[in-house]
Amino acid sequence: MIQNPQRPVSSIAFPILVALSISHCLNDLLQSVITAVYPLFKDDLGLSFAQIGLITLVYQMSASVFQPIFGLFFDKRPVAWTLPAGMLFTMTGMLNLAFASNLHWVLFSVFLIGIGSSVLHPEASRITSLASGGRRGLAQSLFQVGGNLGGSLGPLLVALLVAPYGRSHISLFAILSLIAILVMIPVCRWYKGYLTRIKSAPAAMKPHLAMPLPMNKTVLSIS
């Protein structure tokens, strides 16, 4: 019996969901490091509150505004290894942040970290849905638990590993990036297998893509 690829999977893939939750935890942990090290940057680089605000703006722009752009792109061209690619951006930004000697370098670093998050979240959410076996509420909850946990652990680790020793110890968080990439490998293999099955399935059984509404209907719906 051929599995209908319009459905996520026939049964919930708990190992994949756990790996995604761990990946989300590590990603959001790394993202939360940025705000936690603001006092260090203010003291070390003599930054004003306005400059600290600029750091936040650049990070939020890259971490939030770019998400739908990447989501739209990967909707049309899904790539199995997107997750580790996003984490590589984050790792590069974290290493740069550890040794940034001026505001421009800091801005470049947080931009890379934000891009990593923008790349990761849309595809991770998609794979979470695919691995849910139809139990999307449970799957999404597991995914969100990881992110919330990571966001709360980041500042604590900064207090333990960075604050007593200096900003250069931010580079230690690159180790967590590598761990996240290792955790993502089985997820990517699973997703690659799914994409392969979709491509090889008969045309009539391939999932139907949602078409955008015409402009007049879109405006009417919003209004």
Annotate each language-model stretch with its function.
Residues F143-K192:
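Helix-loop-helix hairpin linking two adjacent transmembrane segments in secondary transporters
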Residues S32, Q60-P68, G151-S152:
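Residue-level signature of mid-helix packing/kink "hotspots" within the transmembrane helices
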Residues A19-P39, L47-F49, F70:
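Extracytoplasmic
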Residues S109-G146:
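Cytoplasmic helix-loop-helix junction between adjacent transmembrane helices
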Residues L20, H104-V110:
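Short hydrophobic/alpha-helical segments at membrane-entry points of transmembrane helices
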Residues P186-P212:
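Flexible cytoplasmic inter-helical loops of multi-pass small-molecule transporters
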Residues V65-L103:
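Conserved MFS/SLC helix-loop-helix module at the cytosolic interface between two early adjacent transmembrane helices
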